[in-house]
Amino acid sequence: MSMSDPIADMLTRIRNGQIAGHSNVVMPSSKVKVAVAKVLTGEGYVSSYSVSDKNGKSELSVDLKYFEGQPVIEMLKRVSRPGLRVYKNKDELPKVIGGLGVAVVSTSKGIMSDRDARKAGIGGEIICYIA
């Protein structure tokens, strides 16, 4: 089965895993998914991530984070998708929930948070919002 939007699949697996109370979720790995997981870990939304090789297939395992039994991630929303790409320059980068959330941005310097993109003075494709 081909997957038209693997990033949306990753975000859905994380969202569903937290709703179900799982400690971690496993999914097929790619460079983009690992970069998004790195941003999620750096911003404190997930505990950690790891990439392993099973039967010749690379798998990404994301360890979910909870605070007092509640998921740390309250909102996880895909913005730019294959049918409608969303690009913003450095001055138009959004502040998610007034700066309390994070926008994951794909830039020419790699995938990073909106704060890092503002510091670097570059814009790019808005992958998702997290709060």
UniProtKB/Swiss-Prot annotation:
Extract the Pfam families matched here. Ribosomal_S8
Return the PANTHER family for the record: 40S RIBOSOMAL PROTEIN S15A
Which function does this protein serve? One of the primary rRNA binding proteins, it binds directly to 16S rRNA central domain where it helps coordinate assembly of the platform of the 30S subunit.
Native source species: Hydrogenovibrio crunogenus (strain DSM 25203 / XCL-2)
- Cited NCBIfam families: PRK00136.1
- Alphabetical UniProt keywords: Ribonucleoprotein, Ribosomal protein, RNA-binding, rRNA-binding
Which Gene Ontology molecular function entries are recorded, alphabetically?
Answer: rRNA binding; structural constituent of ribosome
Give GO terms for biological process.
Answer: translation
User: What is the name of the protein in this document?
Assistant: Small ribosomal subunit protein uS8
Q: Which residues form the signal peptide?
A: none
Record's GO cellular component terms = ribonucleoprotein complex; ribosome
Q: How does it assemble?
A: Part of the 30S ribosomal subunit. Contacts proteins S5 and S12.
Q: What family is reported?
A: Belongs to the universal ribosomal protein uS8 family.
